[in-house]
Swiss-Prot record:
SMART domains with a match to the protein in the record: AAA, ClpB_D2-small, zf-C4_ClpX
Gene Ontology terms: cellular component: HslUV protease complex
UniProt name for this protein: ATP-dependent Clp protease ATP-binding subunit ClpX
Any one GO molecular-function label of the UniProt entry: ATP hydrolysis activity
Source organism (scientific name): Streptococcus pyogenes serotype M1
Subunit record text: Component of the ClpX-ClpP complex. Forms a hexameric ring that, in the presence of ATP, binds to fourteen ClpP subunits assembled into a disk-like structure with a central cavity, resembling the structure of eukaryotic proteasomes.
Domain of life, per lineage: Bacteria
Domain ClpX-type ZB positions: 1-54
Encoding gene, per UniProt annotation: clpX
Residues the record lists as binding Zn(2+): C13, C16, C35, C38
Matches recorded under PANTHER family: ATP-DEPENDENT CLP PROTEASE ATP-BINDING SUBUNIT CLPX-LIKE, MITOCHONDRIAL, ATP-DEPENDENT CLP PROTEASE ATP-BINDING SUBUNIT CLPX-LIKE, MITOCHONDRIAL-RELATED
Binding site for ATP: P119, T120, G121, S122, G123, K124, T125, F126
GO biological process entries: cell division; proteolysis involved in protein catabolic process
Length: 409
């Protein structure tokens, strides 16, 4: 019932007392009525309270050890990177909380945005996702290779902010305290140390565009994205409290580190030392190396925290398959359990899966596709075979030389 007379009885709002003649619409409940004006007022009150809850949440930021404990539940290895991220994230949200209550004469704390360097499949994206989830803040992922500077065909950097606003259900106050992860940042590095006189649509220009929102600005974001709707009303969002994490593989940067350390490696004296492998060189990266790779100094300066991730080995990948709370083996065991079937992986099968991922150079992100390949036929047949009680995945099954072993009742 809404906004009309019933049996010539005039209806009044149970909250403000206005009659149906004084408002646009009245909604009827069980002996209760509410007008459209009270509905709108209620929505505003709820919105304000939710915004206050966001601010309140930030006053209870998990300590670095607590953040590390969460990361350890889901992410295998990368201990040094996890510690660096835990400290950086804690300091960032402590800064946000401090800024909300600071006086004008207090110390101005700068943002600690993060640069993650590591090979494909080493866990960069997953680390950022896990941190955002543990903090219950909006999270958005963007690919740097799809971005172009304003005026060129491609995606504007402002669209990254739109993704975050959408993740926050268009609650701008909540989005302003979210986390944005920009992947493939190494792909927009300048091609060489000399600045080209031609326009660099996908390189330095994009770095300059990203620089503005990373360091903190009030950006105008088109709610429908892109440049197709020039007359649309813009959303204003302040990026000063958004944590930006950027990541990339930076293939070949270890060679730059080797060149810089060359004199120390072959020379004599107290500064001389020997570094054994590329993984160790990754831990020696400094801003000078990143600049030589092709990121501009201003951009590097806005990313003071550098976390280097190492290539995952067979042992690491087996741990990823079996140990975390959301381990892939546990997920597939749960899937088959819904059909009343037990799933087991031989130790050799797990090693074969890990080795395949290493051969394909996909790291942890390639593990699921390998299991899917191995189990596709089984997952197709099992729901129709009610006598099957157990499936065992062998090394031969992973290598495609035989089918998984089935046990029946």
């Amino acid at each position: 019932m809404a906004g009309s007379r019933t049996n010539d009885i005039k209806v009044y709002c149970s909250f403000c007392g206005k009659s149906q003649d004084d408002v646009k619409k009245i909604i009827a409940g069980n002996n209760v009525f509410i007008c459209n004006e009270c509905v709108a007022l209620s929505q505003e009150i709820i919105k304000e309270e939710l915004a206050e809850e966001v601010l309140a949440d930030l006053t209870e930021v998990p300590k670095p050890k607590e953040l590390l404990d969460v990361l350890n539940q889901y992410v295998v290895g990368q201990d040094r990177a996890k510690r660096a991220l835990s400290v950086a994230v804690y300091n960032h949200y402590k800064r946000v909380s401090f800024t909300e209550s600071r006086d004008d004469d207090d110390v101005d704390l700068q943002k600690s945005n993060i640069l993650m360097i590591g090979p494909t499949g080493s866990g960069k994206t997953f680390l950022a996702q896990t941190l955002a989830k543990s903090l219950n803040v909006p999270f958005a992922i963007a690919d740097a290779t799809s971005l172009t500077e304003a005026g060129y065909v491609g995606e504007d950097v402002e669209n990254i902010l739109l993704k975050l606003i959408q993740a926050a259900d268009y609650n701008v106050e909540r989005a302003e305290r979210g986390i944005i992860y920009v992947d493939e940042i190494d792909k927009i590095a300048k091609k060489g140390e000399n600045v080209s006189i031609t326009r660099d649509v996908s390189g330095e220009g994009v770095q300059q565009a990203l620089l503005k929102i990373i360091e903190g600005t009030v950006a105008s974001v088109p709610p429908q994205g892109g440049r197709k709707h020039p007359n649309q009303e813009m959303i204003q969002i302040d990026t000063k409290n958004i944590l930006f994490i950027v990541g990339g593989a930076f293939d070949g940067i270890e060679e730059i580190v080797k060149q810089r350390l060359g004199e120390k490696v072959i020379g004599f004296g107290q500064n001389s030392r020997k570094i054994d492998d590329n993984a160790s060189y990754m831990q020696e990266i400094i801003s000078e190396d990143i600049q030589k790779f092709g990121l501009i100094p201003e951009f590097i300066g806005r990313l003071p925290v550098v976390a280097a991730l190492e290539q995952l080995n067979t042992s690491d990948l087996i741990q990823i398959l079996t140990e975390p709370r959301n381990a892939l083996v546990k997920q597939y065991q749960a899937l088959l359990s819904y059909d009343g079937v037990e799933l087991a992986f031989d130790k050799e099968a797990l090693e074969a899966i890990a080795n395949k991922a290493i051969e394909r150079k996909t790291g942890a992100r390639g593990l699921r596709s390998i299991i899917e390949e191995t189990m596709l036929d089984i997952m197709f047949e099992i729901p129709s075979q009610e006598d099957v009680t157990k499936v065992r995945i062998t090394k031969a099954a992973v290598e495609g030389k035989s089918k998984p072993v089935l046990e029946t009742a």
